[in-house]
Amino acid sequence: MTSSIFRTIGIIGYSRHPKAVHTYDILYHWLYSKGITVIIEHHAASLLNVQKAVVGDLNDIGNYADLAIVIGGDGNMLRAANILAQHDIKVIGINRGTLGFLTDLDPNSALVELSDVLSGHFINEKRFLLDVTVQRYNKLIRLGSAINEVILHTNTIRDMIEFELYIDDNFIFSQRSDGLIISTPTGSTAYALSAGGPILSPTVDAILLVPICPHTLSSRPVVINSKSIICLKFSKVTSELKIGYDNQTPVLVCKEEEIFIKRSNHYLDLIHPNNYNYFKTLNIKLGWSQNIAETKK
């Protein structure tokens, strides 16, 4: 039995792929053998044949666990992050997806790296979220939160959006485009990157605004202070207009409504092994070329 600074650990996974399920099983028995109390999220528990296991939802894990381990791809992490960010819990991910910017542990070496993490050797990163509210009938209604991005878009590919952007009550521009991405630094390697936005280091205290196919050459991505409050207004709505956040169901927006996006009071307490380096991760995940010294070896 090995000592651990984490007494209770949650296991979270949504994939039914045999390799992912195998990781759930190996991880559960490994943690259990160390005398750690393990809470398995319902989806993962339904795929395991574990007798007398403690099973709960994301809020149960957030309330009672010290650490949550998410197994899967970045989508699985996003799915869990919005709930876990509302609790005082650290989160780490084992990659069973594709890129794995958020779930960065290699499943083949995860137990070795987790041994160091359980001993207290890890890097801590606090990733902020964005809160989305809509002003509807003179009332502010909270829609949800996003760890990656908030996306304004239409329901059909042929229609453009006309909207006005305000930052801290100051008019910035009006635009006709296919939409707008409002991204955190965490989300700058996701949809915002595909739309031509820059990559922001996760510790940068900023919000990224990236137009989607704007109908003007002068419209460029903009980086603003994370303390700014963003407002979207719509002078004309000719098709179904929606606001989406991460992988959650988009919400329909009407002409008379205004959308507000600001930095959330909650954050995702993400941890990494001590050998983690963000730019090395970018190099590997995005296929950047090697440096000159390495190519001469």
Curated annotation (Swiss-Prot):
The active site is at 74 (proton acceptor). Its EC number is 2.7.1.23. Its main location: cytoplasm. NAD(+) binds at residues 74-75, 79, 148-149, 176, 178, 189-194, 248. It holds the Pfam family NAD_kinase_C. InterPro entries: ATP-NAD_kinase_N, ATP-NAD_kinase_PpnK-typ_C, cNMP-bd_dom, NAD/diacylglycerol_kinase_sf, NADK. The keyword Ribosomal protein does not apply. It catalyses: NAD(+) + ATP = ADP + NADP(+) + H(+). The keyword Oxidoreductase does not apply. One of its GO terms (biological process) is NAD metabolic process. Involved in the regulation of the intracellular balance of NAD and NADP, and is a key enzyme in the biosynthesis of NADP. Catalyzes specifically the phosphorylation on 2'-hydroxyl of the adenosine moiety of NAD to yield NADP. This is NAD kinase. The lineage of its organism: Bacteria, Pseudomonadati, Pseudomonadota, Gammaproteobacteria, Enterobacterales.
